Amino acid sequence: IIAIDSGFPLFFTQQRTGFMGRPYTLFKLRTMKRNAEKKGAEWAKEKDNRVTRCGKFLRKWRIDEIPQFLNVIKGEMSIVGPRPERPEFQEDLIKQVPHWNCRHLVKPGLTGWAQIRYRYASDADASEEKLAYDLYYIKHASTLVDLQIILSTLRSIAQGSR
């Protein structure tokens, strides 16, 4: 479907910052137009005009995230944890947002407390608000909390909401 809608490549890789600040390559299905960032890195937005028609569907049902299970298998991510950030944004966030690096005390996740409670952060101010949810998760992480997050994520996916 991706190839019919917007051509190849089908997969998208991007550097992210993981556990203890280590970089790794994140895998996703491509949902944006090719060369969407030819002008440089941009924050993703809820209504992002760089997203293809097919990409809107894939994102709505979170199908674009499925390749990240490879990152989980490789030990770079867990199912639940703070979402990983891009190094391009990471440097600024470390300077602007107190305690930002605390997010790296756990592996990044496919879903997290911030994703079910806050959604998108498209600037440093929103990222600071979202950090409070990540820190709450880190402080209260447990099998029960992980299960609650997973069930909330599955409910959100079933409803087709982000």
Question: For each of these PLM feature ranges, what is it?
Answer:
Residues 1-36, 71, 143-162:
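A hydrophobic, helix-centered structural microdomain
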Residues 1-4, 19, 90-93, 102-103, ...:
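Intrinsically disordered, low-complexity segments enriched in polar/charged residues with Gly/Pro
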Residues 9-50, 111-132:
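Short, glycine-rich, amphipathic interfacial segments at transmembrane boundaries or analogous
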Residues 34-37, 56-59, 78, 132, ...:
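A broad detector of the eukaryotic-type serine/threonine protein kinase catalytic domain
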Residues 97-162:
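C-terminal terminal-structure detector
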